[in-house]
Amino acid sequence: MALDFLAGCAGGVAGVLVGHPFDTVKVRLQVQSVEKPQYRGTLHCFKSIIKQESVLGLYKGLGSPLMGLTFINALVFGVQGNTLRALGHDSPLNQFLAGAAAGAIQCVICCPMELAKTRLQLQDAGPARTYKGSLDCLAQIYGHEGLRGVNRGMVSTLLRETPSFGVYFLTYDALTRALGCEPGDRLLVPKLLLAGGTSGIVSWLSTYPVDVVKSRLQADGLRGAPRYRGILDCVHQSYRAEGWRVFTRGLASTLLRAFPVNAATFATVTVVLTYARGEEAGPEGEAVPAAPAGPALAQPSSL
């Protein structure tokens, strides 16, 4: 279990490094003003950030997801696996329930982590910046708003993570079965990458409008007086001002991110397990990867 956990953490780091620039673009598109939009779309946002802030601008807020990575993987792996065993048998419904339980519990870390990430991603470059880093951001929020401020957006995070993790594990299980992902298959890695990437896309599509609301709530008040009184008020104001399309803002960037993030995660997990388990090689010298580790460790929504 410790080895699987280590491999999952390594895969998660790879996924964060690959996907964070897309996440920065997504957040900026989600929260920009409709009256005076700064970006015309995903590609324009990428170009503008690089031009104005260099490539490093795409990695603003990176420290927060990296810091929370180990704890999130520990929670997801432990809760999903134990829940599935407690339910007694492996079925599509139980895969969904186990994934949903894992998604709900990891919100304790995911919500503050994403709050800091969002604030840093929206912070202007230069000496006048408000936050020095992820820890400083959370410390300042706690100092001004207390524990409630650190957990801003918790309900919307729960509404996003709980069903999306359920959908992810359900989809991943169905795809790995359909593709015939078995230990010893020389096409195992490409199949896992395809299953993981596709599952990530499906899970994001299932709850993306909630993610838009969460981002707006967590960014609210950063550049002026707070606008929203809660989730329903945010939905109402956003829809009234911008129509239903507001709930798809940043979707292209998110879907572009979803597949490579999961591909990087699964490739890294497979490589780590292959080398680390060399002592467990079969009679022909081929390392036997642990198929169940992949779906339990990879999570598409937070990292």
Curated annotation (Swiss-Prot):
Pfam family for this entry, one: Mito_carr
MF GO annotations: basic amino acid transmembrane transporter activity; high-affinity L-arginine transmembrane transporter activity; high-affinity lysine transmembrane transporter activity
InterPro entries: Mit_carrier (IPR002067), Mitochondrial_Carrier (IPR050567), Mitochondrial_sb/sol_carrier (IPR018108), Mt_carrier_dom_sf (IPR023395)
Membrane-spanning segments: 2-22, 61-81, 96-116, 153-172, 187-207, 255-275
Biased composition regions of type Low complexity, renumbered to the chain: 284-303
Subcellular location per the Swiss-Prot or TrEMBL entry: Mitochondrion inner membrane
Region named Disordered: 282-303
GO cellular component, one term: mitochondrion
Catalytic activity: L-lysine(out) + L-arginine(in) = L-lysine(in) + L-arginine(out); L-histidine(out) + L-arginine(in) = L-histidine(in) + L-arginine(out); L-ornithine(in) + L-arginine(out) = L-ornithine(out) + L-arginine(in); L-homoarginine(in) + L-arginine(out) = L-homoarginine(out) + L-arginine(in)
Keyword Cytoplasm found: no
Keywords, sorted A to Z: Amino-acid transport, Membrane, Mitochondrion, Mitochondrion inner membrane, Repeat, Transmembrane, Transmembrane helix, Transport
Keyword Ribosomal protein: no
A Gene Ontology BP annotation from the UniProt entry: L-lysine transmembrane transport
Residues in Solcar repeats: 2-86, 90-178, 185-275
Membrane topology term: Multi-pass membrane protein
Family recorded in the similarity comment: Belongs to the mitochondrial carrier (TC 2.A.29) family.
Function: Mitochondrial transporter of arginine, lysine, homoarginine, methylarginine and, to a much lesser extent, ornithine and histidine. Does not transport carnitine nor acylcarnitines. Functions by both counter-exchange and uniport mechanisms. Plays a physiological role in the import of basic amino acids into mitochondria for mitochondrial protein synthesis and amino acid degradation.
Protein known as: Mitochondrial basic amino acids transporter
Gene for this chain: SLC25A29
